[in-house]
């Protein structure tokens, strides 16, 4: 089977190695598309020359791969994969959409679709996918974070900020974590899918130049006709990798749930109480605790697959 993959390979790292090793495991012939200098310029990438990158790539492949391998120049996003020259393509989650576009082109030209093999991200110890940009910017070396980790929480609530910072410190406490707030507006009293959409919107709007955008939203959802209060967290990083987490949802007491159609849930909590959870538990469980649980859950997938 002929397997293809592509990239710029400006700085060869553990993520590239995972892709190349997978391609060499699957195929008896591997075709590696290497971004041309012109294509790199069009994408705004300041990289070494094609010939220099090709030489480094050839040396690396010789160390890890024992099947026939060809390096070809890529002048567009699709390369030889769109013309029928390959049987399968190895991609990362970041480039999976390109593979789908290639298959659309192939089907349009009556060429059998490629088998798409997705290789998971290889993460640095900050939970963010390793990339040449992060290495060249001096943020990571050998998979280890060497600069402060900047977290931007999409909120004006100090409670949400504290919940996010505590969760990050608990799981990534070996890093220098800096946490700021970015006020983000979402619809009041979200319910159902609005809770998830609101969390994602907060994460996207807060990211900016930070390493993580954190979106936390809470609202009423229904499970089998039962009104529940759920806290949701969306974590979006500077590489575009999005992960999710929720805190345990709990049932809203029936006498309160009956009033939800015309009364915001916050107005059902007696004055002076921190939250519905705190009111029901007599302070044993707080809103901050539940939000921290949601952020912690969203971080868990990022602890797997670290270099």
Q: Which residue stretches match the model-derived regions?
A:
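Nucleotidyltransferase catalytic core that binds NTPs
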Residues: 1-151, 160, 170-176, 185-189, ...
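Anionic-ligand binding patches
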Residues: 189-307
